């Protein structure tokens, strides 16, 4: 699927599990709300920002993307010139530009801030899209960077992680107390940890729905930004080209990918809106 979910959520899931272990070892009492909030905040935001800070390295390593330092051909020269022009128009620093091997038509942007980003495109995109269509895709990715989508996503995920950690322990303590007959609450038996683990999984699903809703919202904004930088008709043409190429992506995540989630995915868990909705939104917009 064309998603940005797997690595990012895997990192945050690992943090949730680690938080459970560490808080248990440190004896953090779920009845001590201040201590719980502090620990949940540290672990909740920790995973998000570690993932964000490592996002460029992870993206390069997982896709095999090669950064263009000295253009070797006309295509690479065009890529650098186009990204430089769009970055200047968007008011951001020049991102690193990379190409990775992949048959799918796709591109992504990632990085910890607006002036230290990475924009990469697949060889499938370069082989199957016209320059006008590719220009629109690059504009879409530059818009992600200019909008600060990566840092905003990390902040949102940090809040959601913290919420999941706290709520799972508070509700888990209540359930464990009710089951054990301990009216003072805060049971620390094996059942308590099982309950908390299950609740983290359940609440984590709801948190994922929220983060994916935000992801879909930001795709519309990035489409509008791409239309402003490259032209609305070019942006529409790029999306229409994607409709003709529904191949499966091998992209990992924590990257702002241009594609869409697989057609079999439930809409609540889709990181991108359906292509027809994105095209309709562009047709209804006032961007030239």
From Swiss-Prot:
The chain crosses the membrane at residues 5-25, 34-54, 155-175, 190-210. Its EC number is 3.4.24.-. Signal peptide: none annotated. Binds 1 zinc ion per subunit. It comes from the Bacteria. One of its GO terms (biological process) is proteolysis. This is Protease HtpX. It comes from Stenotrophomonas maltophilia (strain R551-3).
């Amino acid at each position: 699927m064309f998603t940005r979910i797997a690595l990012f959520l895997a990192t945050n899931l690992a943090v949730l599990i680690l938080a459970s272990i560490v808080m248990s070892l440190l004896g953090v009492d779920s009845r001590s709300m201040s201590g719980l909030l502090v620990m949940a905040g540290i672990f909740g935001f920790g995973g998000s920002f570690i993932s964000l800070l490592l996002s460029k390295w992870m993206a390069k390593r997982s896709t095999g993307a090669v950064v263009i330092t000295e253009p070797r051909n006309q295509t690479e020269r065009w890529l650098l010139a186009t990204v430089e022009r769009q970055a200047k128009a968007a008011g951001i620093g020049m991102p690193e530009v990379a190409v990775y091997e992949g048959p799918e038509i796709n591109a992504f942007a990632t990085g910890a801030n607006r002036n230290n980003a990475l924009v990469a495109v697949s060889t499938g995109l370069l082989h199957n899209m016209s320059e006008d269509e590719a220009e629109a895709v690059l504009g879409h990715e530059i818009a992600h960077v200019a909008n600060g989508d990566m840092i905003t996503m990390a902040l949102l995920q940090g809040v959601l992680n913290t919420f999941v950690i706290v709520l799972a322990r508070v509700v888990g303590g209540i359930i464990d107390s009710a089951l054990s007959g301990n009216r003072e609450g805060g049971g620390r038996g094996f059942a308590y940890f099982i309950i908390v683990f299950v609740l983290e999984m359940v609440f984590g699903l709801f948190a994922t729905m929220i983060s994916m809703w935000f992801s879909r919202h930001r795709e519309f904004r990035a489409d509008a930004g791409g239309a402003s930088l490259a032209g609305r008709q070019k942006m529409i043409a790029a999306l229409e080209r994607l409709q003709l190429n529904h191949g499966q992506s091998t992209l990992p995540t924590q990257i702002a990918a241009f594609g869409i989630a697989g057609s079999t995915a439930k809409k609540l868990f889709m990181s991108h809106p359906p292509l027809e909705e994105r095209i309709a939104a562009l047709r209804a917009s006032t961007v030239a």
